[in-house]
């Protein structure tokens, strides 16, 4: 299961975060607290998160409800957008022709001296392959970032960056579920990929009266 981190101030302002280590804002903390209760009820076996604090803190909220520790994996970090980091997407669309080109770019387009989509997808897929090898049949929560997760999901399903643009963006603290099939089933049914998308961008409303001090 993939979970995007809770909201940050940069999400509200429409700024590209990339690898900037932005904290959750108040709404983001409420989102994390709320989704944690839902995911804990699914009885996950492990939680693995990007080390950036917006993902790490979301994962720790889930872990606190599920009674699990959080493993950190650098491969789950968000795409590196280079010099675009911290800038408003609306400003970049108006003022930076390279940004406009990058939005419709091929998979190997390097964003502002940062990363390509294929580089991001390769590391997300590698994490998923490791998870299958270590936790076969388990329910594993990967907490990370919007671009990284959407692109990684598309690669798992046999698509590419172009296909990923057919998927809507991931909301803060939404979850998506991808199931892994045994190799013999994939071969017998002629599937293109052992991965199946079971749910995408699911979420729950965030209550406005959560009292963290009382644990509710």
PLM features per residue range, with description:
Residues 131, 138-146:
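Generic beta-sheet signal
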Residues 33-100:
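Phosphate-coordination/substrate-recognition cap region in phosphate-metabolizing enzymes
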Residues 6, 146, 202:
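Active-site metal-binding loops of divalent metal-dependent hydrolases
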Residues 1-5, 142:
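Short, hydrophobic/glycine-enriched beta-strand segments
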Residues 79-91, 133-138, 154-216:
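Acidic, low-complexity terminal tails and accessory targeting/binding regions
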Residues 43-45, 136-140:
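Short coil/turn segments at beta-strand junctions that form active-site/ligand-binding loops
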Residues 1, 71-73, 198:
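General small-molecule cofactor/ligand-binding pocket signal
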Residues 7-62, 110-125:
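Loop-to-helix element that buttresses phosphate recognition and phosphoryl-transfer chemistry
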């Amino acid at each position: 299961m993939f979970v995007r981190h809770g909201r940050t101030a940069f999400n509200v302002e429409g700024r590209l975060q990339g690898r900037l280590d932005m904290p959750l804002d108040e709404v983001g903390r409420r989102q994390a607290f709320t989704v944690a209760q839902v995911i804990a009820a699914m009885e996950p076996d492990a939680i693995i998160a990007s080390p950036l604090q917006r993902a790490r803190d979301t994962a720790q909220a889930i872990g606190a409800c599920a009674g699990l520790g959080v493993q950190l994996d650098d491969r789950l970090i968000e795409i590196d957008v280079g010099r675009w980091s911290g800038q408003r997407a609306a400003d970049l669309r108006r003022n930076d022709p390279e940004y406009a080109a990058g939005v419709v770019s091929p998979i190997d387009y390097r964003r502002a001296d940062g990363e390509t989509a294929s580089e991001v997808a390769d590391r997300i897929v590698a994490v998923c392959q490791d998870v299958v090898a270590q936790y076969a049949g388990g329910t594993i929560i990967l907490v990370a970032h919007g671009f990284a997760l959407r692109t990684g999901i598309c690669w798992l399903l046999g698509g590419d960056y172009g296909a990923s643009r057919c998927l809507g963006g991931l909301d803060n603290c939404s979850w998506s579920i991808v199931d892994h099939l045994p190799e013999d089933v994939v071969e017998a049914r002629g599937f293109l990929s052992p991965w199946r998308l079971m749910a995408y961008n699911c979420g729950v409303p965030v209550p406005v009266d959560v009292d963290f001090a009382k644990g509710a």
